[in-house]
Amino acid sequence: MKKNFILNFATKNVKEKKLSFGVGITLWALIVFAYMIFVMNWGFASAGLNGKAGISGYLGHFFPNANEAPGTVVNQAVNWGITIGRGIGSVLVGWLIVKISHKYTVILSLFFMLFGIIAPYSPTYAGFIILRTIFAIGGTMQIILIQPVVSNYLNQRQKAVISQFSPFFYPIGTIITLIPFAGIIGQEAQKAFRDNWQIVFLVIGLLTLIPLIGYIILGTKFDLYPSNIEKRNKQEKLSLATFFKQKDTWYWTILYGSWLVAVVFPFTFSKPIFHRLIGDSDGTFNDKISVFLIFFLAGMFLGPFTIGLLSKYQLQRRKYISTIITLGVFFYVLATVVFVLKVGKNYEYAKSYTDGWTWLFLFLGLFMGICLWGIQGVMLNLPHEYKGSNPYRVGFQFGLIWGLGYTAFTIATIITSLVNTPPGIDLKKLELNNVDGYALGAYILIIIFSLVSSIGLALLKEPNPEYKKLLKIRSFSEIERIKK
């Protein structure tokens, strides 16, 4: 292992300690809490704190004159750049872990997240975006930094369980950002949130100090323990180039990029697309769509205990994952049909929840969430299940999976955004009495991109081909739990 001054400092007085479950869970909890803070900070920006230029929110703050606000394409380009930055940060995680150790990579990523504290007080919009990009790079790294902890401290059964709970923190954070803008707390409270957007971002940013201080005090240098270094020296030498040359890396990119589209695009695009599909330019059903998204995210809390249970058993994974993702996308299509043909046609019930069609719409969102969120734990556990898997390899692999997955996600975002709002097209001049063709085209793309994951799964190898196929099981007694 090549040394540098940071690694030299990190390796001083390293005393090997037992890799106990309690320590592992503590480190895991600190990192997933940091990830939830990132999701909250990031989500509030698009959930409602953005406001409108010349009126409220951070757009009203930076552009008090609405005529000076950046156009749609510029705003989209900014978002694309930030997402690409997150992808680059994800790819760099594996390299940083090798160069400065896991503990100091975590601390560095949390330091990046502290830029979220000062971003709201930037004197310019450009500064605000740059500071939030640095913050986002640090926040994105958290989901990858979980994996070496899980790989080192937990056995195979414990990994299967914890992989079910790790995904909880994205929907929890996102639900928190949606609640103030779902009509639950009233219009005055919504206005207060938007008017005090800097304080909201400041409070969330300050929460980052909890995992930062916690990890400085409690974080361990498990990857620098002599026994781990000895194991790593006996293993194949890995680099980013090694993984770039492997076909599996690109199959994982297809799978994770497509899955990200399936779970993030409904949150990003449902409101504008749903409104345009029914010709509603006033956002009359905005609150109801927010509640639909809350139901979708709430599916995360049921998914791991239903859909996600497969990780605990000796059953093949690939076809199961593909089927569940397809089913989740199917529920999204059904929910859209119900909204466009029934819920969105009934303006009398736009603000109430007493009609049956609304509840069907909401529960389809829940079923969609159970499938798409519930399957995440099964997917996250897959790299741990392949023969030859080790913490060193998993750290590199997850960095690339998320980094390249975010890149694929960004490409899908650019294409969908350009179809949804083509440059030079004035949406205000579209005929709202008819279905908006641009919005419909964007929606069809979302469905296609969400289903591409099946291609990645078909190309990947089954991690345990000796496991039984679920469809060939004839009784529960044939299903065996994974041994430690």
Swiss-Prot record:
Keywords: Cell membrane, Membrane, Transmembrane, Transmembrane helix. Its main location: membrane. One of its GO terms (molecular function) is carboxylic acid transmembrane transporter activity. It comes from the Bacteria. InterPro entries: Hexose_phos_transporter, MFS_Mycoplasma, MFS_trans_sf. One of its GO terms (cellular component) is plasma membrane. It is found in: Cell membrane. The keyword Cell membrane applies. The chain crosses the membrane at residues 19-39, 78-98, 111-131, 134-154, 165-185, 199-219, 249-269, 289-309, 321-341, 360-380, 398-418, 440-460. Pfam families: MFS_Mycoplasma. SUPFAM superfamilies: MFS general substrate transporter (SSF103473). It is a multi-pass membrane protein. This is Uncharacterized protein mhp246. It comes from Mesomycoplasma hyopneumoniae (strain 232) (Mycoplasma hyopneumoniae). The lineage of its organism: Bacteria, Bacillati, Mycoplasmatota, Mycoplasmoidales, Metamycoplasmataceae.
